[in-house]
Amino acid sequence: MQDITMEARLAELESRLAFQEITIEELNVTVTAHEMEMAKLRDHLRLLTEKLKASQPSNIASQAEETPPPHY
């Protein structure tokens, strides 16, 4: 009787392990896809930021254009 219980428990553990391995592989594929998508989005954001900076003049004057502060 003890052997049947041990065999059933072992079979259950092997089954769970197989499902866990499948789940881990699926999660790995998902994480890898998300990392690639995030890298693309970072590049896209960087390009948009550069375009925005290039297209809008800055409201802050450069130090050469600033008038010197009054001296007291």
Swiss-Prot record:
It comes from the Bacteria. Pfam families: SlyX. Residues 55-65 have a biased composition (Polar residues). Coiled coil: none annotated. Residues 52-72 are annotated as: Disordered. InterPro entries: SlyX. NCBIfam families: PRK02793.1. Belongs to the SlyX family. This is Protein SlyX.
